[in-house]
């Protein structure tokens, strides 16, 4: 699952993403290796502690982040937040959270981008495109294989931000200006 709609009202869209089952399975697998090495080893308790701590460190490093996106029409802002247990441990609970705040009126388009994920193939992520020309992904990691899930979230986000209405209006304005310029050329 790419992102789940936590709540949706007329003025608020709250999207959330938790670590995937693959990520949790990897965590359990790596921790199991450390525990098995400690259990079956004839080394001292200090080495056994090192095995478990080392594997726990690697397991937490490979755990995906918790990601959240809140689009609020009342405040006119989108807040993209990323939480990481690994960063929290490294900074001794002072960090572990990255936050990006964007004005909703700056978002021009919402697209699904394809990313190459090493060893696994293709992944998909939603990209927010701004009027300044800058692009920013909605999440830090791509989801593997399920393009339809990502497109459904992108469609929901486009509908909430009313970007499809903006496109329709701009196309209508372009067509009317084209027909006016054609009419002016015909008169000459």
UniProtKB/Swiss-Prot annotation:
Spans through the membrane: 20-42
Which cellular component, as a GO term, is one annotated location? endoplasmic reticulum
Q: Where does the record say this protein resides?
A: Endoplasmic reticulum membrane
Where mainly located? endoplasmic reticulum
A single Pfam family it belongs to is Cybc1_Eros
Q: Superkingdom of this entry's organism?
A: Eukaryota
Write out the similarity annotation: Belongs to the CYBC1 family.
Q: What does this protein do?
A: Functions as a chaperone necessary for a stable expression of the CYBA and CYBB subunits of the cytochrome b-245 heterodimer.
State the name under which the record lists this protein: Cytochrome b-245 chaperone 1 homolog
Which source organism?
A: Xenopus laevis
State which gene encodes it. Answer: cybc1
